[in-house]
Curated annotation (Swiss-Prot):
The gene is Zc3hc1. Residues 54-72, 326-338, 350-359, 369-383 have a biased composition (Polar residues). Interacts with TPR; this interaction mediates ZC3HC1 nuclear envelopes (NE)-association but also required for proper positioning of a substantial amount of TPR at the nuclear basket (NB). It comes from Mus musculus. It is found in: Nucleus; Nucleus envelope. A motif (Nuclear localization signal) lies at residues 395-401. Pfam families: NuBaID_C, zf-C3HC. This is Zinc finger C3HC-type protein 1. The keyword Cell division applies. A zinc finger (C3HC-type) spans 102-156. Residues 406-420 have a biased composition (Low complexity).
Length: 501
């Protein structure tokens, strides 16, 4: 009876509050929802009513509840989700479960093989059990691909409005966008200057990058820079070194860009499709390759007469300012300290280091380094009888120090060359063929027969060269630019010969 009496009282109160507006039975449910929303909204700190989708997102506790309609259409948010798929958390997955597809439906990685929706906070375990049954493996992959849509909560918007497919593809149907992005990457890479990695001519031959192709790309970049009057000061500063231009051109063609233009930041390059970051200090750089190249072309030192008339061969390898400073500091250090920094054994402070030398060598040692007696000297790794061999003033020790300087001056020689294609992740559109095929099947781009079985960077190269040929002006500066390209490739070949020798 109490329940039946509350109904008329509630209806009467609503009618008293809203008057003739509530008398329509069609408007009553909507007004009740508005009354309920007005009681819930102040808890979120607002005073205006919100729509139903925003209410569900706030109840779910998503920190981006108000931006949920824009999250699926935001390219920046899309690649933020892609960046969470690191190699440690997401490895060994087929192409249909690539991070680009998972991020398309709002998923991020929180643990190894564990996905989480960025909106409804639902979890999805995407582990693939090792099995020798290929049929079961394909079934599990198909199940996980279907779960990318079905594993969301009931009111989540991702299954109905995922991110556009074009976010995970290269804009092959928009040459203007390709050229603009190509130019931006090129300019950012030129800021690294001599810190750019050295490229191996064998890799360029494998990529079918000929001298004419690089020359045409450099000419295209030069033409595009002429259309940007505001960037002329920057381009005049960036266009001083041909080696830097050619290397930056090849890297930007393969999708690489400088991570940060701050001078204090580390030399990092990034692919903004697979979000891979590569530190250039692990590869041979242009600066070190140029010094090795100049050394291989006859810039070696003549023998310097050493102690007792023996010649000492100190390498005269062209050095960077930092190495020149290090070499000058090494020249002022006494032989005793040189011996201490070479030996891996424990250091023992001894004030009678001159006792191990012969009486004939003692005056020469004291004249060469008066402070050697107070320097710490390393203990020899053998018995005390071999102390005479480890004398700092002996010619043998000075020759070893020369070899140490030689190895330190060419410390980048064992570093590998940078391969602009193999450094991408295997699902990256720049090196992946599948996504380029999907571009044709979906009809979003109209690329004829240029990319039926080509990686993304090669499709971009074909489009850029076609655009350059279609807009080819009269023969003005093409010959001079072609000469620049041939000069750069001669330098590439010289680097290869110097590194192999």
């Amino acid at each position: 009876m109490a329940a039946t009496s509350e109904g008329p009282l509630f209806a009467a109160s609503i009618e008293k509050t809203w008057g003739s507006v509530v008398r329509s039975p069609e408007g009553t449910p909507q007004k009740v929802r508005e009354l309920i929303d007005e009681g819930i909204v102040p808890e979120e700190g607002g005073t205006e009513p919100k729509d139903t989708a925003a209410t569900f997102q706030s109840v779910d506790g998503s920190p981006q509840a108000e931006q949920s309609p824009l999250e699926s259409t935001s390219k920046e948010a899309f690649f933020h989700r892609v960046e969470t798929f690191s190699s440690l958390k997401w490895a060994g997955k087929p192409p249909e479960l690539s991070p680009l597809i998972c991020a398309k439906y709002g998923w991020v990685t929180v643990e190894c093989d564990m996905l989480k929706c960025s909106s409804c906070q639902a979890f999805l375990c995407a582990s693939l059990q090792p099995t020798f049954d290929f049929g079961r493996y394909k079934e599990r992959c198909a199940e996980l691909k279907k779960s990318l849509c079905s594993a969301h909560e009931k009111f989540c918007f991702w299954p109905d409005s995922p991110s556009p497919d074009r976010f995970g593809m290269l804009p092959l149907g928009e040459p203007a966008v390709l050229i603009s992005e190509f130019l931006d990457r090129f300019q950012s890479l030129c800021h690294l200057d001599l810190q750019l990695p050295s490229l191996r001519p064998e890799d360029l031959k494998t990529m079918c990058l000929t001298e004419d192709a690089v020359s045409a790309l450099l000419h295209l970049l030069e033409d595009e820079l002429d259309f940007h009057a505001d960037d002329r000061k920057t381009t005049s500063k960036l266009g001083s070194d041909v080696q830097v231009q050619a290397t930056a051109c090849v890297l930007s063609l393969c999708g690489w860009a400088c991570s940060s233009l701050e001078p204090t930041q580390l030399s990092l390059i990034t692919c903004y499709q697979c979000m891979r970051k590569v530190g250039l200090w692990g590869f041979q750089q242009i600066e070190s390759s140029m010094t090795d190249l100049e050394a291989s072309f006859g810039l070696t030192s003549s023998p310097i007469p050493g102690v007792e008339g023996r010649p000492e061969h100190f390498p005269l390898v062209p050095e960077s300012p930092r190495r020149m400073m290090t070499r000058s500091q090494d020249a002022t250090v006494s032989p005793g300290s040189e011996q201490s920094e070479k030996s891996p054994g424990p250091i023992v402070s001894r004030t009678r280091s001159w006792e191990s030398s012969s009486p004939v060598d003692r005056p020469e040692l004291e004249a060469a380094s008066p402070t050697t007696r107070s320097r710490p000297v390393t203990r020899s790794m053998g018995t005390g009888d071999s102390a005479g061999v480890e004398v700092p003033s002996s010619p043998l020790r000075r020759t070893k120090r020369a070899r140490l300087c030689s190895s330190s001056s060419s410390d980048t020689s064992p570093r590998s060359f940078f391969d602009p294609t193999s450094q991408h992740r295997d699902w990256c559109p720049w090196v992946n063929i599948t996504l380029v095929k999907e571009t044709k099947e979906n009809g979003e781009t109209e690329v004829d027969a240029c990319t039926p079985a080509e990686p993304g960077w090669k499709a971009v190269l074909t489009i850029l060269l076609a655009h350059k040929r279609s807009n080819q002006p009269a023969e003005t500066d093409s010959m001079s630019l072609s000469e620049k390209s041939r000069k750069v490739f001669r330098i590439f070949r010289q680097w290869e010969s110097s590194s192999s020798s």
